[in-house]
Amino acid sequence: MINQLIANIKKTGAPIVVGLDPMLKYIPEHIQKKAFAEFGETLEGAAEAIWQFNKEIVDKTYDLIPAVKPQIAMYEQFGIPGLVAFKKTVDYCKSKGLVVIGDIKRGDIGSTSSAYAVGHIGKVQVGSKTYAPFDEDFVTVNPYLGSDGVNPFIDVCKEEKKGLFILVKTSNPSSGEFQDQMIDGRPLYELVGEKVDTVGRRLHG
């Protein structure tokens, strides 16, 4: 999948990603009014406004950018309708040839991590049928619970030819409380970065 992202970057000449992190209060009033007229001031109405706003952004930019990054929490706050809007956004972006990076920052272990991986970049079996629930191309993963939180995602990536962005050093103001802690003279995030690099080299190509 990284090859597709690189190809898109070369094609557009734009090593950037457009974040789709919608906040209802910033969505243009005419979009909100139309959505609320159809669905009322409900979760469904909010989700429809988000979806229409995203669609307009994508329609205006899809031939200029290589990828988009929807932040799932902005959709989850509107419950099931919000997740429907997230899925519609993912599908629409992919139909326009964009690489979709699901900004989900999952970090758990064992079967829970496996379920996250399957739900977002893998396939799930339901009886005799198979489904790709959210079907992003990449997802973001938090590695600070250890390798048993990341390995299930790696396994699914191998199977489905998907990709990961693994957090190493984050930009939030309090990140240094843990990430900058010194271990044998080196900050923790450097050790995490080395581990991620090792995994990446093993999966390269």
Residue ranges and their predicted role:
Residues 1-60:
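N-terminal glycine-rich anion-binding loop in soluble enzyme alpha/beta folds
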Residues 108-205:
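Conserved anion-binding
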Residues 58-65, 92-95, 154-160:
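Acidic (Asp/Glu)-rich catalytic clusters
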Residues 16, 100-102, 164:
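Hydrophobic beta-strand scaffold residues
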Residues 2, 54-58, 86-90, 150, ...:
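Generic structural signal for well-ordered alpha-helices
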Residues 46, 70-82:
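Glycine-rich, proline-tolerant flexible connector loops at the mouths of alpha/beta enzymes
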